[in-house]
Design a protein with these regions (language model features):
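Conserved PLP-binding active-site segment in aminotransferase class I/II-type PLP enzymes
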Residues: 1-18, 29-32
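Conserved N-terminal alpha-helix of the aminotransferase class I/II PLP-enzyme fold
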Residues: 63-96
Length: 390
């Protein structure tokens, strides 16, 4: 029996995933709804992390703290071992989360009114963060090729030429789970360099390589253009630690670092909570065996979902290269998004994410989180099937 086969009760724990569905979906009562929507896992974090946090809690004093040298070194070691990426400790800046890091990058490295480029369908904060900070969002959608979303570099260059100042890259891609290859990444860098555009690379899903694919950090292949890149990463998605709220930016350019440090201080994010250093260090030094067991478990869940759901006429399932999020294509059914979401909630008692949350390019798709026990996945599949059995 796998450690991931256990089902842990999460209702009534102030879990966004389990306890906020009434608010998110506009329901009076969601007690019978199975949540397979937001991207956190239903698995316990590595035992080493829990033990380290418990030991820290037993100290009983929770004063101001800072990121330990051991924790910083664990980041360097993790990136070297996991991604063959060699970074300097001095390049690391800490933040309360990757979304907060994205916001700090926008505020520190662009000016109000500047244009920020994104490539939808993509993670919703890519739309919201620049706009809420007074920047203009320019969209250059990915295009479909052989059932996958890819870059249209002719359109991408045309967009960059519109006086764009920053590009936000999702690497690996969310929601599609694509692992961008070296040629794609190098072309992104080349074109951004041509138009003097900085690149903010969200790489929070980097460790979640499902079927043996290799994550390529953008900065690793950027060559002489490395200083135009800020890489945003965290252990939180990898080890199910979102509530700990710790992330880091890797910034090789000293001028950008100083600007980001100033914004960190100005926004009151100069220090992390006292558990952040402990959790990060334990995860990166002792969490690898847990992760290595997790990835094939998620892969098996994905294979099961694809096999079962594609028995429904008009449903196509894309298994991602990365993440634990499945992208479901229902466009052949000719159903409106509102209708299929209502059916899923009312008939299937199942909460998934609508594709348009990731931009209009996501219309006709659903996102399903399969980072849960196989029994829960089977339950979710049966609920999905029930919707189309009537």
């Amino acid at each position: 029996m796998s450690i991931f086969d256990q089902t842990i009760k999460r209702r009534c724990t102030n879990s966004v995933k389990w306890d906020a569905m009434e608010k998110v979906y506009g329901l009076n009562d969601a007690s019978d709804i199975l949540p397979m929507w937001v991207a956190d896992m239903d698995f316990p974090a590595p035992i080493a992390v829990s033990k380290a946090l418990q030991q820290h809690a037993e100290h009983t004093i929770f004063g101001y703290s800072y990121m330990s040298e051991e924790a910083i070194q664990s980041i360097v070691d993790w990136q070297s071992t996991r991604h063959d990426w060699h970074i300097e400790k001095e390049a690391i800046l800490f933040c309360n989360g990757v979304v907060a890091a994205l916001a700090n990058c926008i505020v520190a490295l662009t000016n109000p009114g500047d244009k920020v480029l994104i490539s939808p369908p993509v993670y919703p904060p890519f739309f919201n963060i620049p706009k809420s900070n007074g920047r203009e969002v320019v969209s250059c959608p990915l295009i479909e090729k052989d059932g996958l979303f890819v870059y249209d570099f002719e359109a991408f260059e045309q967009s960059l030429a519109q006086d764009v100042k920053a590009y936000i890259l999702c690497n690996p891609h969310n929601p599609g789970g694509y692992v961008w290859d070296e040629a794609t990444l190098k072309e992104i860098v080349r074109l951004c360099a041509k138009y003097d555009v900085i690149i903010i690379s969200d790489e929070i899903h980097a460790d979640l390589m499902i079927n043996g694919d290799k994550h390529i950090p953008l900065a690793k292949v950027a060559g002489d253009e490395i200083n135009r890149i800020v890489t945003c990463m965290a252990p939180t998605k990898t080890f199910n630690l979102a509530g700990i709220q710790v992330s880091y930016m890797i910034v090789t350019d000293k001028k950008k670092r100083l600007k980001l440090e100033a914004i960190n201080m100005a926004s009151g994010q100069g220090s992390l909570n006292t558990f952040a250093s402990v959790a990060l260090h334990a995860a990166y030094t002792e969490g690898a065996p847990w992760l290595d067991e997790l990835l094939p478990y998620i892969s098996a869940n994905m294979d099961y979902v694809k096999t079962e759901l594609e028995q429904i006429p008009g449903i196509r399932v894309t298994i991602p290269q990365s993440t634990y999020l499945i992208w479901i294509d229902y466009r052949e059914l000719a159903l409106e998004e509102k209708e299929i979401m209502n059916r899923l909630l009312e008939i299937g008692k199942l909460a998934l994410e609508p594709g348009t949350k990731y931009g209009e390019e996501g219309r006709g798709f659903l996102r399903m989180n399969v980072a849960c026990s196989f029994d829960t996945v089977k339950d979710g599949v049966e609920r999905f099937k029930k919707v189309f059995a009537q």
